[in-house]
Amino acid sequence: MNFKGVKLLKNSKKRLDFLPNTLNKYSIRKFTVGTASILVGATLFLGVSNEAEAAEKIDSPTKEKVATTEEAATKEEAATTEEPATKEEAATTEEPATKEEAAIAEEPATKEEAATTEEPATKEEAAIAEEPATKEEAATTEEPATKEEAATTEEPATKEEAAIAEEPATKEEAATTEEPATKEEAAIAEEPATKEEAVTSEEAATKEKAAIAEEPATKEEAAIAEEPETKEEAATTEEPATKEEAAIAEEAATKEKAVTSEEAATKEKAAIAEEAATKEKAAIAEEPETKEEAATTEEPETKEEAAIAEEPATKEKAVTSEEAHGINNKNKQLLDMDKNSTIDEKFDYAKQAINELNINQKDISNIEASIKNNSDLKNLSKEELNNEILRAALVNESNNNDYGLQTLSAIEPLTTNVRNKNNSLSPVSRLKMLATATSGQNVNDKINITNASLTLNQKNNQHDDNTVWPTSNEQLRLSADYELDNSIKEGDTFTIKYGDYIRPGALELPAKNTQLRSKEGSIVANGVYDENTTTTTYTFTNYVDQYQNITGSFNLLATPKRETVTTDKQTYPMNVTIANQEVSENFVVDYGNHEDHLTNAAVVNVDNVNNQHNEVVYLNQSGDRIYDAKYFSIVQNGTFIPNEVKVYEVLDDNVLVDSFNPDLNGPAVKDVTSEFTPQYSLNNTRVDIDLNRSNMNKGSRYIITQAVKPSGTGNVNTTYELTRYGNEASRYPTGTKSTTVSYINGSSTAQGDNPTYNLGDYVWLDKNKDGIQNDDEKGISGVYVILKDSNNKELQRATTDDTGRYQFNNLQNGTYNVEFVIPNNYTPSPSNTIDNDTIDSDGQKDGDSNVVVAKGTINNADNMTVDTGFYETPKYSLGDYVWKDTNKDGVQDSDEKGIQGVTVTLKDKNGNVLKTTTTDENGSYRFDNLDSGDYIVHFEKPEGLTQTTTNSDSDENKDADGEEVHVTITDHDDFSIDNGYFDEDSDADADSDADADSDADADADADSDADADADADSDADSDADADADSDADADADADADSDSDADADADADADSDADADADSDADADADADSDADADADSDADSDADADADSDADADADADADSDADADSDADADADADADSDADADADADSDADADSDSDADADADADSDADADADADSDADADADSDADADADSDADADADSDADSDADADADSDADADADADADSDADADADSDADADADADADSDADSDADSDADSDADADADSDADADADADADSDADADSDADADSDADADADADADSDADADSDADADSDADADSDADADADADSDADADADADSDADADADSDSDADADADADSDADADADADSDADADSDADADSDADADADADSDADADSDADADADADSDADADADSDADADADADSDADADSDADADADADADSDADADADADSDADADADADADADSDADADADSDADADADSDADSDADADADSDADADADADSDADADSDADADSDADADSDADADADADSDADADSDADADSDADADADADSDADADSDADADADSDADADADSDADADSDADADADADADSDADADSDADSDADADADSDSDADADADADSDADADADADSDADADSDADADADSDSDADADADADSDADADSDADADADADSDADADADSDADADADSDADADADSDADSDADADADSDADADADADSDADADSDADADADADSDADADSDADADADADSDADADSDADADSDADADSDADADSDADADSDADADADADSDADADSDADADADADSDADADADSDADADADSDADADADSDADADADSDADADADSDADKYHNDTADKSNDNELPDTGNNTQNNGTLFGSLFAALGGLFLVGSRRKNKNNEEK
């Protein structure tokens, strides 16, 4: 790869977030031997957090503990002598610090830092000066500390914070007299102890603890002595500093006082002046670094700030005035600025901040120049400017600008600086750790990619620019230029990600490890390729820490990815993303695979790791018959690798992909190598394979794979031949091919299997400068190490870790150069001083470069001896004295005093200013941290004084040296540079002294008091503005959250829930049906059929009783369902609506108006419907006839059923309710419903039939009126259809029908539309809403919409979805829950109130909902309902509520019914469900319990209601509600249970099947739909009944149990009601009785009738089916079968197919329907179909439904099926159950029905079919479809393959690289020879024959 020089781009705005790092595994950025001032600067500007502690323990030669004479240091806690502090708070001497803030006692030490007052620090800790007492307080020694606690003078610190008395030390920390150091730094006083430890007479420091003079720091924070300041502000002794600035004490002692020869630093430790650093911690006296900020003693700061003492002690010891003179540093306050300050203001701020770093003038100039040249200075904020100052300081510190390479032309050179600090190792290590993050970050966004392109690397003139021939050695070239942001650091990463059709590399496999280099060869980043993600991740080396503004470019090879690019002459998009820049080009790829050639071959890849070429050969790709075949291959410049040649027989031609990358691990090939053992030549340059015994003579194809190992430097050429005979001289060639591998840029250099080793060792601090590692000499971290080969090419880079170690890996034998970059302020140790490579220093200085170089040799072993040592370059001081020479003799006399305030400037030998200072009160000055060299000291003459005589005495220490003195320092300090001045003589001036009075003006100086303005700092208080934060109270807006009350709107859902209840109601009714679903009961019918009696719920619907009810409850039921009471209860449920309606009721009442209509209808319809169902049956017949109507009904019913199916959907809704639950119900209902439907049909059956029959019988008679009503319904239904639209009004009627839901009743069957109506009711409610919709839809849809409803149901489904919503509203449920509680009651009510619940809910929700309702529509609905508004609301509801209903919320309530879930348990009841759900169910349970009571109440109520209103039914409904809930729940769970039901469902399914089938069949019937309606009837009758019965049985099982139990349970209370419930509920027992009669009749009749109806329906169906048939069309049926859905099961897949087929067939039906699809349209078609009419529609709907069902409704119906689906859902489960198909079989029967429907219809065999088909169709079809599809596909694929291959052609064939054309002559010669041979043989045979003759 070519890499150009790089340019490093630094983002000056990026904050350098320095984090501590103590892990050896991370490379540490080296900031050279940084000074403590830089460390302080980092704190001042950045506020480094002290997150981590030093990783290693501090070694100290001292004993573990040294007791002091008067004070003992404690281990971790400080005990107080007077008062304990509270937990986690530190007590201050005057004011307490806040929680978790450190109270600083004026001079505290923090944990893990040791400080002594007059005591030495340990080996690795800094000692505190002798006299640490602050200005405010004097150190005392009078209060001893306890064993584990140190006493404080006034208040103790608590467990977590050690507030230490005057002089306690905490564990492992060094404290300064002025301020605490942070967690990882030791505080250094200005006069630390001498060598290793000096134990004073008063105090001794322990190994890891140093006692602090007066006040300790706490564990993590320092206790504040007098007055804590606010967070993040630093206070000075007199004036507070601004945020993030450290206040400096007024009088800081000098950094390093004059050190006498007796006071030299010891061998082991260099005592450091202002900033003594220990190995791991440095406590800084003057400019301490605290966790965030530094503060002074008088006004110490609170959390994260440290207090600074005013007068810190000196470094090594207290120096007397004769020994050294201190420095008077004026207390300066840093200027402040913000982002809007001017450039000059910002620069002034920066200058002052830089001066505070206390570094030499040259460094200051460099940093100031960097800041001044920052083009973005104008836009920098204070924090950003602080970061930039620190960045510039660190860059200036780095001084690593040369690694033995020339400075890149694209890189800004970095200047070398002379440090003016005595830099120790520890601050460097700490600063390095602080400045380096623990791990790199992805910096894709910090790399600017330009000029990125993807082109052909090597173009063949035989094709255009966007075509690539990979097998002809063509590659793609990826090129780009890049620019790196300066904030990128070592360890950061960026990526190059390759797309799906491209990979890196050429013919070679991608290298695992790659490198990005500069143009000089330095490694900029190391890359690792991941073939799983096709991504190369590059990690930057320390190269980016060394240079700025790095720019460069690269060129990488890439090639098409053969695994995905498999077809010749196809265009593929080649995408590569470099960092964040994407490059994309389209290329046509051609591998040159000639399918008509007998031999095709290619080199697939070159594996450099294993040093081999992998080749693939296709033999006889065209499939010719080849006899006596032999294969051989010859290689030049290489050898075949034995055992790597493999032979595969091709079993599937698709494996022969054009890319020569076949899948050899799959079933498409067979490894037959063992049958044809390859034979190798002696030198392995030829391999032969005898294929004579292969199947090639039968046209088989073979694949040969072989591996070649290159043996030379030339191109590797391989030929491949397939011959008839192996003899080359006389061979009859049938195919030849050759390949050639040539190399580009030497990219194929093999690595082979050579072993690799490691090289490395250690860089250490050679304290004794002898070049030999001693045991006590530690490693130096952060040193850059560069590995180069013998040709000086850079190979790897590393940085020494915290222990000084480095290592390079994966190296082969050879000699290497190891370069160590010399750290600043260090000098290389002598090299090779002894003959022991393991401990001596190996590095030798390399000329003028800043590196030492060591040789390292690897010879079959690791070499871990290449090490080098450095010692600290010594620093020196210069200074002396400026005095007033009163006698003017130029010599210092003892009575002559110093002059304060004289400016002294230090310059280098060229006159450049390095430092400036002023003399202190004694006239002393001093410059520290100077290297050996030449300097100039300049004294600025004070105004009014005259220079004295210079060099007047031989004593250099006493005479004056003059105003400018040249000084040379050579390995020593110079404290002899002084000067003197005397007062100017001017008596005249003396007179002017009178003017001295004018000095009174000097008082003007008092104006200097203007400094009082410093008080302006009190403006800091303006921070009080922080109170503005009180605006945070704006959060009060959070109150807006109160809007969350809007969620109360969710209550709307609650209303929805109310509606949900409505659904419940519907379901309630539906459930009533549900109870009908109890139909599950109907199944119960089956069970009870007694449940039939429970269908007495059916009875409920046994509206027969319902007529009974109808009579009493008729309305009760009707009402019960309908409204009257049903609504009353219905309202109860209605109340479900009642609630929704409850308000709804009001509305409900309004609805009751609507419902009233409903009632009117209900009664009418109730009976009507009940009759309707009865009629349904009668209508069924009517429907059959009416099927037109039925279809109309079919629509209505159809939908109803459709809904029924729809209902199934409705069940779906019921399921809707059910679905969420409904489906659940669907299962529960659906099953139940299914039964519901089935039952719905069942109802139809159970009710319809049973009831219908029952009704038919019971009501039939009574319903006979009902029938008349039935007619009414049938008309109603008819109307429903007719009205469907009219029922659109029927809405009200629909409601009516909803009430027709009476259908509810009838359609109680209808699932009282338990379905539709469940939806209907759901819609009732839903319709109420649904009606709203269903009204709306109900309208048209009511019927036609019935399909619409079906859609309504779909809406119902919507409700189903609603249910989904309902569940969603389950949130509503939340309200529901609120209601839940209320539901609890509600449920209690649920039953009674179900609606009551609804109300509760409504109310609860109502209230919540009330908002909701209020919002709601609920009320609105109510109103809406109140009026046609109901419809309006319907809309409203339909909107809100519909969904609200949709919300199924009902379900949601039902779900709310989470209780439902409880119901679920109820569901268990659900199974009981059925009745259980029935209801005790849920609510019984949910409310269960309350409901249980509720249910009991429900029953009770329901009974109460039940009794009172058939509400029993209503309650039943309420139970229904319970069911609804229960079902909803039960549904939900019902499903579960439903599944139980599903079991029931399975019965349900049976029903489901009934449904499913009923639907399916129903669908078939559903197709009958009419039957669906009829179906209701149909189902009810035909299959339904049969199924119903079957189901019934199924139900019988589930329900009977379920109900029995359910009721048993709920009714257990209910059971009285149980069945009585069912009945009780249903009948309110009263009915129950009537029902029981009804039951008796119901079943009796129901079955009888059912049968008769079945026939009737069958006829109905037959009619319906007639239509149905055509539509059912047998297809339908077949689909039915498909639906039969054994497919249903198949359905499940079959459905999938069967659905598809179902659809498809359904489409057949569908087709019949296509409408099925139409059904989606079918629904609309349903209408259309309703035109179909009922028939077609019935079917179509039915089919539509069934299809619809199959499809959408299929889903819907499927719901029916859904129920099936429901079952499908449950169904699927149910179906599964359905498939539990036992029912499925029933279904099969159902299918039979389905078919029978289709046929049944066709045959009107509803009956005949019902059963007979049952079997026949069911399965056979199912299977038939399944198989046919299977084959179909197989073939279709086959065709597809043929089509694909047939079109292949090569317009431009690739040249066979390396092909040998001279063989052509041989070919022709051989051909003619062969022909001649044939003639010769023939001639001889002829002659022989002649001879024999």
UniProtKB/Swiss-Prot annotation:
Recorded topology in the membrane: Peptidoglycan-anchor
Q: Which ranges does the UniProt record give for the sequence repeats?
A: 72-83, 84-95, 96-107, 108-119, 120-131, 132-143, 144-155, 156-167, 168-179, 180-191, 192-203, 204-215, 216-227, 228-239, 240-251, 252-263, 264-275, 276-287, 288-299, 300-311, 312-323
Comp. bias regions, Basic and acidic residues: 54-222, 240-284, 312-325, 955-975, 1837-1851
Span(s) of short sequence motif LPXTG sorting signal: 1854-1858
Principal subcellular localisation of the protein: secreted
CNA-B domain: residues covered: 756-874, 875-984
Q: SUPFAM superfamilies, from UniProt?
A: Bacterial adhesins (SSF49401), Hypothetical protein PA1324 (SSF117074)
Compositionally biased, Acidic residues: which spans?
286-302, 981-1836
Instruction: Region 21 X 12 AA tandem repeat of [AP]-[AE]-T-K-E-[EK]-A-[AV]-[IT]-[AST]-E-E: list its residue ranges.
Output: 72-323
The residue range of the signal peptide is 1-54
Region Disordered: start and end of each range?
Answer: 53-333, 941-1867
Q: What residue spans carry the region label Ligand binding A region? A: 324-755
Q: Which residues form the propeptide?
A: 1858-1893
Q: Where in the cell is it found?
A: Secreted, Cell wall
- Which Pfam family, any one, appears in the UniProt record? Big_8
Q: Which UniProt keywords are listed?
A: Cell wall, Peptidoglycan-anchor, Repeat, Secreted, Signal
Question: What are the recorded Gene Ontology BP terms?
Answer: cell adhesion
Residues modified as Pentaglycyl murein peptidoglycan amidated threonine are T1857
Q: What does this protein do?
A: Responsible for collagen binding by S.saprophyticus.
Q: What is known of its domains?
A: The amino acid composition of the SD repeat region is different from that of other SD repeats, containing a very high percentage of alanine residues.
In the record, the note on similarity to other proteins reads: Belongs to the serine-aspartate repeat-containing protein (SDr) family.
Q: What is this protein called?
A: Serine-aspartate repeat-containing protein I
Which gene is transcribed and translated to give this protein?
Answer: sdrI
